[in-house]
Amino acid sequence: MQNELAQTIPELINWTKEREFSLSLSSDRLAFLLAISIYNNEQTDGELLESDLIDLFRYVSEVFDQSEATLTQRANNAINDLVKQRFLNRFSSEFTEGLAIYRITPLGVGVADYYVRQREFSTLRLSIQLSIVADEIQRASSAAEEGGDERFWRNNVFAPLKYSVAEIFDSIDLSQRMMDENQHQIRERIAELLSQNWHEAILSCEQLLDETSGNLRELQDTLNAAGDKLQAQLLRIQSCLIGRDDLDFVDQLIVNLQNKLDRIISWGQQAIDLWIGYDRHVHKFIRTAIDMDKNRVFGQHLRQSIQDYFNAPWLLYTAKAESLLDLRDDETMLNEAEAVGELPSELEYESLSDVQEQIISVMQAHLAPFRAEGKPIDLGAVLREQLALYPQSRHFDVARIIVDQAVKLGMASLDSQAVYPEWQAINDNGAEVQANVIDQYNK
């Protein structure tokens, strides 16, 4: 039986050669085609006059700052170019007295659709598409369970899966590729913002990062909610094909649809994982830049204040501590006698390793019940509680050990969702921590 799912590569090559396709669209030509497509959608009959095309080209020419003197000639050249490349079809007859009628071709519709409608990839649109797919697969699976001859399967199972479900899957796949391009554009915008004036661009970067993370997560939740149900329906149809050698073309279509659905869902999770990694990279860069750039920012502000002094006068207050005088007699000899008596407890030496081992054992005993009882660990609260029991000189070591021990027990589910926690104060000296609640423990 002839394969009805797709043309072979040689067939496509010969088809392209026979029709002599050759595509070349400059920016102004592409803008002209998009303008024609949008204007065509507003027409009830789908037909365009040459005067309509010239008016559209005039607007494009104004946007691109092109000469008005040669407008008519350039418009005719552009129209002929689109006709030659089969973006437009031209119709004329003896009854039109030399006036031609134009219709946009399927190729023109496809190119314009890519640049116009496919940019609108929203959760609502995805939900509607998946809802249509679910209804089509449901009807196809019900028809498959009824059984029937090959003609029945072609009309009631193969046709809706081939010409409705498969096309919607292709549309979703194309939209996801547009999302990939959109992410690259956002990365370029963030890089441009950070390279110009990063301390003023932090808020804009945060907004771009959060919006993209939220969109990816929302879209993936929608895909996950529908993915398992769609796969179950496809398996339901596939089970009806057992022993039906005459329906191999349906079985091959089902396999292709399953692969497309797996690719669509896996794309979403992969996109989220990659974006989370990029998100963390940007935040690490910002934190490093802030730590390394404090003096440069102060210097910039100072230079700017000096330049604007006459417009906005200001006062500079300085403070200078008095120098300590050397009161020791140069001729006095140092006392090299050995000190006797007991050393105060504050000056007693205790090895750092002994201190750390003591703290580790205490923290392990303190955190173990959280894991045993399945209770979430709020690092901010734990750090505040434990640091209050230690002198300030040990706060850094204690905090580091607590965090190390807590991370060994598990992780926070919000970390994988690109949710950034608020800063929490952990002592009275200005120390803060930024950490999500640990609610997933290692087995």
UniProtKB/Swiss-Prot annotation:
* BP GO annotations: cell division; chromosome condensation; chromosome segregation; DNA replication
Q: Which GO terms describe its molecular function?
A: calcium ion binding
Which Gene Ontology CC terms are recorded?
cytoplasm; nucleoid
Q: What protein name applies here? A: Chromosome partition protein MukF
Q: Name one Pfam family in it.
A: KicB
Query: Could you say which residues form the signal peptide?
Result: none
The task this protein performs is described as: Involved in chromosome condensation, segregation and cell cycle progression. May participate in facilitating chromosome segregation by condensation DNA from both sides of a centrally located replisome during cell division. Not required for mini-F plasmid partitioning. Probably acts via its interaction with MukB and MukE. Overexpression results in anucleate cells. It has a calcium binding activity.
Name the InterPro entries for this protein. Answer: Chromosome_partition_MukF, MukF_C, MukF_C_sf, MukF_M, MukF_M_sp, MukF_WHTH, WH-like_DNA-bd_sf, WH_DNA-bd_sf
Q: From what organism does this protein derive?
A: Actinobacillus pleuropneumoniae serotype 3 (strain JL03)
- To which protein family does this belong? Belongs to the MukF family.
Q: Does the keyword Cell cycle apply?
A: yes
> Region Leucine-zipper: start and end of each range?
209-237
Subcellular compartments = Cytoplasm, Nucleoid
Q: What Gene3D superfamilies is this protein classified in?
A: Chromosome partition protein MukF, middle domain, MukF, C-terminal domain, Winged helix-like DNA-binding domain superfamily/Winged helix DNA-binding domain
Which UniProt keywords are given for this protein, alphabetically ordered?
Calcium, Cell cycle, Cell division, Chromosome partition, Cytoplasm, DNA condensation
Superkingdom per UniProt:
Bacteria
Classify the main location: cytoplasm
Assembly: Interacts, and probably forms a ternary complex, with MukE and MukB via its C-terminal region. The complex formation is stimulated by calcium or magnesium. It is required for an interaction between MukE and MukB.
The question of whether Magnesium is a record keyword is answered with no
